[in-house]
């Protein structure tokens, strides 16, 4: 029996043996395609090739492409675990022809591989063709010798492919495998076609037409082939099983899940193990390709998949995080074919464990709420949308997780009600996917790229040069000219201006002509990853399409930018040396005045970590080693030890930047794939200083730093501030910390003395005789009333207790004023509580102070108000209350 890994390899080997170029799988995050959340088909990386926007990598190609279908139009999430062939992650084997061979050879390749190379029984294969595609029908008869009843004409869109209403399109031919009459189902096109007996294993797309507005308008000048074969499906066929989850890779993953949970994949528990095995693959590959769980976009879909798997782990009795413990089994099965799994294993495990630990805190509460809400429900009932939304909003249960939890009981969820509740909650956590910011104006860039091709970048070796104006864009539309005062985007056939990409900001500078045209360039973009767009303002003259301009990059600004960019490479290496190889770049900003570097790490950096990283980078700067650049293939670069960024799409040739001193093994301190601009030697960076370290999101940290003169000025400002502080403290800068500590101790002691003095003042200062002299008689009652500024309100009751003890019989009231506000308290000795209530007296004073209420006991009460200026009036209110009672 061939393993799934063997089948993948034999497919690729067959087509490379037939002259196809083997193309590595693209990352799951689509490159420069805001219309897709994830790569969901083998042809996605070649979309721009098929539409003519990119040059083919070779005349013919083959690949095994990672795919995810768990969001948007193509969403298999709900069915995963309950059917034989639904997956969130799958591999699409494919062969492609870009204007080379067409139908006959595509069918011949498919038939040869299936029946001769792999030995699949030809009698169990059936082909479908589009109902008008006589050519494909005849080739199946000629090449495969299939009888007429096993070449089925299909008139539906299942056998006609189109990228959209406009662009290339063409008929399809699908190959089905018959799993046997012991399984329900009929051949394609029959009433029983939805059964599981006949399973599609390969789809051949013949791109031969051009369409506009959904109508075919003609034939393509170059006809293309796009085929797709699900690896999991063909593995089931070749391993003699009907269910994808019974193939070797899934059996290993399910076996690992059984081992950790102690629960066999039987009966009702089988679906849970399948969900865990499938979702382990999709979550691990997404994390390896740079996606992290979040509350929106791709990260939210990843979190949904994670939480669905975690709920099923809970159903199997797992009391601790489980998913991260299954990652080694996945790496063993698939790490050789996809090295990014091995490289990202630490981050994958860490992310899964942290997310599961967090979700478990609310999972049980949410499930209890769900059980309470549905306890009296029966099969066929519907859970209201409000409760489903509460589960989402309070406990982090996505709608589909609630659906999944109720599915075994046959209880539906009110989707409309859920949507209404979501709409009403304006600050709902989940944000709709809106694609990238380029989507709105991308059409004009596609038009220009198709007409002019990519901009030639000359800025690696020069900061000035000539460029011919190939397009002028104003307000999203092409124009023929731009005059003084106009703000316009200028595109030239070549430019030394770096376009913003890879975290590095675009260049600024000037354009000019000998006859007086002057243009200020404020920024440079890079839409589609191919064009360099100069954001410009015409200072004088008129720029016409076709003009030749002299282009000058602002060299001082470029030098500051490239110093910061090179510093990010050094800090990346230093972080990995200090913290471990799990550290990977998660984002960066390289501007002229600062740099920002985001990286994967589960906890804050200590002061020692920051100091060590900063020292290590500065040591490499002082070494002043030459920065070298080499061009090589991506595979050779990675083999040479270069760090490649997850999610980046690399062409046939990449730039490998090496900087810093060499190790004993001959490897430079930092070796990375990078298309940015860099210093000539590390000493050009001059100085590196970290100014902050913070969290970006769960598992991602951020360093902000300065280099060169910006770092020097920052240190000078700190030194000046220290000198100013030393002068004010009348000490040396070296003794500022010691002097400040002494002053703080002194202040603390003085504050204590002041508090004690205020208490003594409240008690009469000079003793009981002085205190008695402050007493007054109202009717037959002795009254002591005081206003004390700066007294802590918590000392009021203690002072009143002492006043009661001193007086023996009487009433005392104190108003403590702090920062304009007043605290008011009153006390009545026990012999007078039958005549006077402290609560009533306090309320009288509090009302004057602008407050409300006041509470306590008949012998002691307290309140307060915002108007401390009326403190004496508040005491007078008490005096009036006492005088009124005595009258």
UniProtKB/Swiss-Prot annotation:
Catalyzed reactions per annotation: tRNA(Ala) + L-alanine + ATP = L-alanyl-tRNA(Ala) + AMP + diphosphate
Enzyme Commission number, as recorded: 6.1.1.7
Record keywords: Aminoacyl-tRNA synthetase, ATP-binding, Cytoplasm, Ligase, Metal-binding, Nucleotide-binding, Protein biosynthesis, RNA-binding, tRNA-binding, Zinc
Example of a GO MF term: tRNA binding
Keyword Glycosyltransferase: no
Cofactor remark: Binds 1 zinc ion per subunit.
UniProt-annotated location(s): Cytoplasm
Cofactor: Zn(2+)
SMART domains (alphabetical): tRNA_SAD
Residue runs in coiled coils: none
Primary location recorded for the protein, binned into one broad class: cytoplasm
Gene3D superfamilies: 2.40.30.130, 3.10.310.40, 3.30.54.20, 6.10.250.550, Bira Bifunctional Protein, Domain 2, Threonyl-trna Synthetase, Chain A, domain 2
This protein's domain notes: Consists of three domains; the N-terminal catalytic domain, the editing domain and the C-terminal C-Ala domain. The editing domain removes incorrectly charged amino acids, while the C-Ala domain, along with tRNA(Ala), serves as a bridge to cooperatively bring together the editing and aminoacylation centers thus stimulating deacylation of misacylated tRNAs.
Family: Belongs to the class-II aminoacyl-tRNA synthetase family.
Protein purpose: Catalyzes the attachment of alanine to tRNA(Ala) in a two-step reaction: alanine is first activated by ATP to form Ala-AMP and then transferred to the acceptor end of tRNA(Ala). Also edits incorrectly charged Ser-tRNA(Ala) and Gly-tRNA(Ala) via its editing domain.
Name the UniProt record assigns to this protein: Alanine--tRNA ligase
Organism phylogeny: Bacteria, Pseudomonadati, Pseudomonadota, Alphaproteobacteria, Sphingomonadales
């Amino acid at each position: 029996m061939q393993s799934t890994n063997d089948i993948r390899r034999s497919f690729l080997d067959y087509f490379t043996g037939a002259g196809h170029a083997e193309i590595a799988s693209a990352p799951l995050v689509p490159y420069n395609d805001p219309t897709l959340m994830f790569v969901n088909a083998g042809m996605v990386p070649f979309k721009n090739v098929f539409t003519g926007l990119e040059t083919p990598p070779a005349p013919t190609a083959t690949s095994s492409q990672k795919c995810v279908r768990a969001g948007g139009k193509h969403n298999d999430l709900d069915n995963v675990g309950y059917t034989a062939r639904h997956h969130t992650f799958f591999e699409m084997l494919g062969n492609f022809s870009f204007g080379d061979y067409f139908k006959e050879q595509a069918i011949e390749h498919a038939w040869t591989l299936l029946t001769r190379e792999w030995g699949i029984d030809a009698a169990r294969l059936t082909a479908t063709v589009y109902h008008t595609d006589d050519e494909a029908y005849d080739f199946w008869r000629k090449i495969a010798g299939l009888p007429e009843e096993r070449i089925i004409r299909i008139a539906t869109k299942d056998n006609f492919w189109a990228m959209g209403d406009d662009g290339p399109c063409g008929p399809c031919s699908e190959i089905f495998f018959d799993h046997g009459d012991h399984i329900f189902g009929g051949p394609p096109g029959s009433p029983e076609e939805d059964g599981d007996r006949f399973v599609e294993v390969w789809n051949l797309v013949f791109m031969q037409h051009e369409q506009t507005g959904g109508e075919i308008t003609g034939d393509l000048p170059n006809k293309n082939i796009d085929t797709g074969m699900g690896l999991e499906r063909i593995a089931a066929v070749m391993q003699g099983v009907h269910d994808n989850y019974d193939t070797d890779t899934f059996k290993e993953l399910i076996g690992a899940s059984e081992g950790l949970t102690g629960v066999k994949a039987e009966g009702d528990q089988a679906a849970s193990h399948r969900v865990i095995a499938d979702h382990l693959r999709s979550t691990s590959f997404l994390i390896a390709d740079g996606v992290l769980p979040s509350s929106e976009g791709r990260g939210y879909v990843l979190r949904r998949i994670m939480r669905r798997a975690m709920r099923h782990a809970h159903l199997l009795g797992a009391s601790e995080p489980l998913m991260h413990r299954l990652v080694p089994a996945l790496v063993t099965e698939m790490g050789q074919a996809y090295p990014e799994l091995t490289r990202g294993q630490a981050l994958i495990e860490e992310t899964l464990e942290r997310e599961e630990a967090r979700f478990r805190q609310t999972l049980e509460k949410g499930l209890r709420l769900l059980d309470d809400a549905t306890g009296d429900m029966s099969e066929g009932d519907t859970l209201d949308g409000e409760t489903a939304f509460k589960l989402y909003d309070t406990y982090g249960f996505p709608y589909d997780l609630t659906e999944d939890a109720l599915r075994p009981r046959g209880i539906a969820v009110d989707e409309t009600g859920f949507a209404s509740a979501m709409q009403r909650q304006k600050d709902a956590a989940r944000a709709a996917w809106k694609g990238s910011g380029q989507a709105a104006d991308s059409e004009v860039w596609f038009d220009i790229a198709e007409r002019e091709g990519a901009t030639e970048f000359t800025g690696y070796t020069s900061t000035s040069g000539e460029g011919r104006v190939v397009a002028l864009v104003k307000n999203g539309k092409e124009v023929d000219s731009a005059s003084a005062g106009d703000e316009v985007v200028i595109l030239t056939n070549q430019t030394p201006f770096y376009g913003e990409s890879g975290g590095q900001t675009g260049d600024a500078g000037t354009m000019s002509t000998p006859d007086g045209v002057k243009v200020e360039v404020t920024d440079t973009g890079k839409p589609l990853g191919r064009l360099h767009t100069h954001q410009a303002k015409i200072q004088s003259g008129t720029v016409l399409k076709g003009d030749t301009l002299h282009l000058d990059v602002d060299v001082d600004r470029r030098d500051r930018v490239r110093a910061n960019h090179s510093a990010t490479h050094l800090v990346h290496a230093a972080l990995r040396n200090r913290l471990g190889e799990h550290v990977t770049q998660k984002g960066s900003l390289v501007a002229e005045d600062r740099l920002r570097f985001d990286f994967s790490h589960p906890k804050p950096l200590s002061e020692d970590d920051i100091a060590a990283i900063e020292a290590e980078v500065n040591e490499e700067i002082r070494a002043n080693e030459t920065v070298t650049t080499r061009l090589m293939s991506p595979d050779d670069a990675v083999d040479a030890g270069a760090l490649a960024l997850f999610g980046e799409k690399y062409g046939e040739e990449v730039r490998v930047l090496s900087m810093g001193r060499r190790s004993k093994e001959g490897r430079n301190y930092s070796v990375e794939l990078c298309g940015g601009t860099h210093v000539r030697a590390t000493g050009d960076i001059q100085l590196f200083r970290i100014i902050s370290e913070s969290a970006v999101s769960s598992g991602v940290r951020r360093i902000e730093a300065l280099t060169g003169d910006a770092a020097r000025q920052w240190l000078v400002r700190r030194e000046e501030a220290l000198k100013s502080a030393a002068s004010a403290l009348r000490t040396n800068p070296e003794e500022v910390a010691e002097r400040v500590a002494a002053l703080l101790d002194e202040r603390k002691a003085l504050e204590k003395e002041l508090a004690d003095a205020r208490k003594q003042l409240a008690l009469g200062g000079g003793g009981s005789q002085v205190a008695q002299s402050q007493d007054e008689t109202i009717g037959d009652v002795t009254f002591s009333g005081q206003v004390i500024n700066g007294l802590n309100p918590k000392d009021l009751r203690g002072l009143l207790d002492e006043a009661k003890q001193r007086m023996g019989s009487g009433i005392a009231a104190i108003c403590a004023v702090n920062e304009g506000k007043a605290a008011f308290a009153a006390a009545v000795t026990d012999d007078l509580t039958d005549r006077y209530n402290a609560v009533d007296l306090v309320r009288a004073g509090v009302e004057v102070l602008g407050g409300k209420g006041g509470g306590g006991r008949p012998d002691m009460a307290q309140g307060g108000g915002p108007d401390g200026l009326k403190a004496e009036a508040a005491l007078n209110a008490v005096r009036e209350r006492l005088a009124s009672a005595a009258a």
